[in-house]
Amino acid sequence: PTMAPFCKDEEKYKVVEDLVKQVEELKNNSTRIDGQLITDVLTVNGVRFSLEDGSWGLIRASSNKPSLVVVTESPASDERKKKIFDFIDNLLQKTGKIGEYDQKI
């Protein structure tokens, strides 16, 4: 599913830039999400990370709204998809620059 938390236009690109660095560092520190290692990090127009089982999460700035775009998917389970969302949401909430989501899982 795709979720869009509010983030001011003048802040959203900096928030994403900071998250790119954090996710790369978490991968380098062998961080696990729901028991799965982060195996790959792509940083084109945001950050997309993959886990060992093929599950993934993505954070990028919306190109046409004052918001971010958050996507999570998991072939393993809906529960893992939710845990990935919780992981991303935790990182975003720590920025102090995120408002309400249009929806959550």
Regions found by a protein language model. Give the residues of each.
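Phosphate-binding and adjacent anionic-ligand microenvironments
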Residues: 1-71, 77-105
